[in-house]
Amino acid sequence: MKVKTNYVNAPVWKEVNVKSRIPESLKMLEEMARNIWWAWNDEATEMFRELDPELWSFVKQNPVALLERLSYEKLEALCNNKEVLSRINHIYDKFKTYVNTKPDATRPSVAYFCMEYGLTHVLKIYSGGLGILAGDYLKEASDSNVDMCGIGFLYRYGYFDQSLSMDGQQIANYEAQNFGSLPIERVMDENGSPLVLDVPYLNYYVHAYVWKVNVGRVPLYLLDTDNEMNSEFDRPI
């Protein structure tokens, strides 16, 4: 069966600086949202869902997008709810105890390379079984406190969503990911500028930004070639 391809939203990005509006008493939510630990911790996932169940469904279970969209009134209500604050602090204490536990320095360190990682549906950098397996390896390495570092690629479009045309044909819809609303962070150099890796290819270089995903205790570094330094041919790498 032939599947048609449709890029549903070609992105036009502009750089902006956004100041967080999350109250101080809820700041720990931002830290937890930026670590994929919540993806395999039911208690943490349920905590985010209960902040605003309707909005949680709307943002497709993305805690970073959830916190960005919570209204001022909702944030104020959460700050004044002692039961909610107590639960958030309880889960945050468990999270900090988990991530602050150092690996056994006598065990060998591991560098894990893969083209895709299936960590959560929120981060579309996988397409099948290989990605799910790689994602599970990183999660298990985190739970087992293995000194591991993952390396991969950050894809702008990732895997596609399927829809049907009027005549019943399958259509592959590629929706661009907005990196600013994902549980990832840009890696900076010693001068505070975005870190760039220059990778030799044929007779020239491909330039890649570096992003970091916190997978519990395991850092995953992703290369991003979709930038103005590269040609239109190289940007989709």
What are these regions (language model features)?
Residues 1-237:
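Catalytic cores of carbohydrate-active enzymes across secretory and cytosolic contexts
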